[in-house]
Swiss-Prot record:
Name the record gives this protein: DNA replication and repair protein RecF
SMART domains (alphabetical): AAA
Originating species: Brucella abortus (strain 2308)
Keyword Nucleotidyltransferase: no
Cellular component, GO annotation: cytoplasm
Amino acid sequence: MEAKDHIERRPDRVSIRRLKLVNFRNYAELSLPLGPGHVVLTGENGSGKTNLIEAISFLSPGRGLRRAAYDDVARANAEGGFAIHAALDCMIYGDAEIGTGTAGGGEGGRKVRINRIAASADDLLDYARILWVVPSMDGLFTGGASDRRRFLDRMVLAIDTAHGKRVLDYEKAMRSRNRLLNDGSNDDQWLDAIENQMAELGTAIAAARAQAMRLIAAMIERLPAEGPFPKADCFLEGALESRIGVEAALDLEEDFRRTLRDGRARDRAAGRTLDGPHRTDLIVQHRPKSMPAALCSTGEQKALLIGLILAHARLTAELSGMAPILLLDEIAAHLDMGRRAALFGILDELGGQAFMTGTDRALFDALAGDAQFFNVSAGQLTGI
């Protein structure tokens, strides 16, 4: 999907008007009515602020912003699994009721129901796009490539709803191939079939990533040159991604298929598949300083990450027609007064609903009158 040269109309607001939790982390039971605006959650560390926005992150595909095992999410010493229910106001699809949760005891994955009808997790993207910035992402640019790749794929998923299934199917096929190789199988016909699937999916994954990076780069170019958050230049370091747009997709697919076939002995010895989009890395540079993000200061990395997420949020709103719901955990504490004010202004401009957490309410005073404030203590919320 192509980004327009400008936003022809304001993206539709999607907001949570009521959130209910049962046996989620430290919440035995919660029913929280909400307005359409921003929400600020303050309280001491360990009170449950992040747990609440983690619950909201489960209204999108995946395992939430902590990537936790479902049994770990269910409240300790509670019988059964957990349940999350959200009533959404969505101008595109009308009001929607979303429920998700698990049965507990390791019984299957989580279930999703939309308007009381069983649905897939990917169907959630038809009703809301949810993005987040959390402290665990502070080391994104200096950590392992797998974290950046996961971050990249979540960005792609927000603008290409089929991407998540492609990645899951590719990883499933790759595990099957690894298992066959490790078992010493010489069933070429079976391996050929799996590698055909990997080649097709892998090329599609690389193409989707390259397209997303091109669109994000175009969005960043449209932003003011001297904005409050530094501009990022993003590059993909991957054998397939680097050739997207240069060579025909069918040629790339055939070449990857040949690489997999020729690499069977090497991959069997290594115990894993050594080539493919599962090895791709996202390289980010701080444009004003012409410096790799990994070499920037901690504060510069944080500002760069926030700027990238906000640019992606603009793109997501433009392409989907829905202003994304943003989950911003402990974000204000890392920003000076000028950048906090700029962030709040950008959130208003985006037109979506943002949930922000922090230990110091004073950091959010500029939002007084424009946001709902709650104090969180031991899994209990009190309006302030």
